[in-house]
UniProtKB/Swiss-Prot annotation:
Keywords associated with the record: Acetylation, Activator, Cell cycle, DNA-binding, Nucleus, Phosphoprotein, Transcription, Transcription regulation
Keyword NAD included in the entry's annotation: no
Stretches for region Disordered: 409-446
Segments of this protein annotated with the region DCB2: 274-330
Upper lineage: Eukaryota, Metazoa, Chordata, Craniata, Vertebrata
Gene name as annotated: TFDP2
GO biological process, one term: regulation of transcription by RNA polymerase II
Name the UniProt record assigns to this protein: Transcription factor Dp-2
Record's compositionally biased regions (Acidic residues): 431-446
Record-linked Pfam families: DP, E2F_TDP
Length: 446
């Protein structure tokens, strides 16, 4: 009722001094003080936007604090929410204090909460100091030091470090566990996308940082030589197994023919059971032999050099392998040897018949004969009778190591170079604006 008498409210009890729509609402609290009027001596009538001189006798105060709109007309009592003493501000004082013009939607700087801006700047500083880049570096160091780890192990250690009271960090820069675990999750995804780490189920393994082209080329050359040596070892093992099969089957056929000629098996004292070993030494060598009671263990002591030959070596010297290991195999023996192995391995018998040089065949840099008839785009062998199956299979193995390029195929050249591409070309730089946007996103990837 008092506010209505002094002209601050309209007839329907609305605050008339705060109806102007050009002003934006303030976030602060404005204190309004309404005084009951005991006696007024103003004979003039109060017009809508003018206030005449008023003599007011002040009684008990009632403070109403509510966020409302500011007005540019009339006299109001405003006060800071932090100081209880009200102050009288007239129309001209409000215009000078706020400094706004009609149409300007920005609030006066005087009414901005300074504490809010300081906390925002503090939060921004913490975010720049402990963002995704910072946690990526920490996670990278953890995984590199451990070699093999898991997400929970890395996250638990980082949570322990950042929440440890002994850590010299500011009190307002402490991170909650959920935020740290989310940052660790994002950092692991970034490192995995850059091929720095690998993840299989819950196991995380360290691969390595991207290197320059020279070092990558050197590493590829070392890997290439290692694979070539492995191919040679596999070829030697395959050759030994094929020769054993040929020797055993050839021995079986010979014994079968002898039984047919002699019309019965040979005498027991004239046969040697497989497997066996033969020890060869000089006639002047003194041999001390000890045999266990069960005759399963033998101990030999020699005072001179000696040789040990197994049954396969003996069969080779007997000619049961048709001389394939030395490259002295006739066409008839080669045909017979092919009949003793599966059809899929006949091509390797032809390669073995060339001698020990077969172990290095197709692995030299200047030797492209084995891949000249190989379609690199599909990995299939072109139908030519002059190319045997063994060489084609070797070419496929060599091609997998990046050794060969087709001489007349530009497409295959680009494909091979793409396979040996350096990991250093993986984009590893991030935009600062994108990083800030990611950090402002509060949604957890979990």
């Amino acid at each position: 009722m008092t506010a209505k008498n002094v002209g601050l409210t309209s007839t329907n009890a609305e605050v008339r001094g705060f109806i102007d729509q050009n002003l934006s609402p303030t976030k602060g609290n404005i204190s309004f003080v309404a005084f009951p009027v005991s006696n007024t001596n103003s004979p003039t009538k109060i017009l809508p936007k003018t206030l005449g001189p008023i003599n007011v006798n002040v009684g008990p105060q009632m403070i109403i604090s509510t966020p409302q709109r500011l007005t540019s007309s009339g006299s109001v009592l405003i006060g800071s929410p932090y100081t209880p003493a009200p102050a009288m501000v007239t129309q001209t004082h409000i215009a000078e204090a706020t400094g706004w013009v009609p149409g300007d939607r920005k609030r006066a700087r005087k009414f901005i909460d300074s504490d809010f801006s300081e906390s925002k700047r503090s939060k921004k500083g913490d975010k720049n100091g402990k963002g995704l880049r910072h946690f990526s570096m920490k996670v990278c160091e953890k995984v590199q030091r451990k070699g093999t780890t898991s997400y929970n192990e890395v996250a638990d250690e980082l949570v322990s470090e950042f929440t440890n009271s002994n850590n010299h960090l500011a009190a307002d820069s402490a991170y909650d566990q959920k935020n740290i675990r989310r940052r660790v999750y994002d950092a692991l995804n970034v490192l995995m996308a850059m091929n720095i780490i690998s993840k299989e189920k819950k196991e995380i393994k360290w691969i390595g940082l991207p290197t320059n082209s020279a070092q990558e080329c050197q590493n590829l050359e070392i890997e290439k030589q290692r694979r070539i040596e492995r191919i040679k070892q596999k070829r030697a093992q395959l050759q030994e197994l094929l020769l054993q099969q040929i020797a055993f089957k050839n021995l079986v056929q010979r014994n079968r023919q002898n039984e047919q000629q002699n019309q019965g098996p040979p005498a027991l004292n004239s046969t040697i059971q497989l497997p066996f070993i033969i020890i060869n030494t000089s006639r002047k060598t003194v041999i001390d032999c000890s045999i266990s009671s069960d005759k399963f263990e033998y101990l030999f002591n020699f005072d001179n050099t000696f040789e040990i030959h197994d049954d396969i070596e003996v069969l080779k010297r007997m000619g049961m392998s048709f001389g394939l290991e030395s490259g002295k195999c006739s066409l008839e023996d080669l045909k017979l040897a092919k009949s003793l192995v599966p059809k899929a391995l006949e091509g390797y018998i032809t390669d073995i018949s060339t001698g020990p040089s077969w172990l290095n065949q197709g692995l030299l840099l200047n030797s492209t004969q084995s891949v000249s008839n190989l379609d690199l785009t599909t990995g299939a062998t072109l139908p030519q009778s002059s190319v045997n199956q063994g060489l084609c299979l070797d070419a496929e193995v060599a091609l997998a190591t990046g050794q060969f390029l087709a001489p007349n195929s530009h497409q295959s050249s680009s494909a091979a170079s793409h396979c040996s591409e350096s990991r250093g070309e993986t984009p590893c730089s991030f935009n600062d604006e994108d990083e800030e946007d990611d950090e402002e996103d509060s949604s957890s990837p979990e």
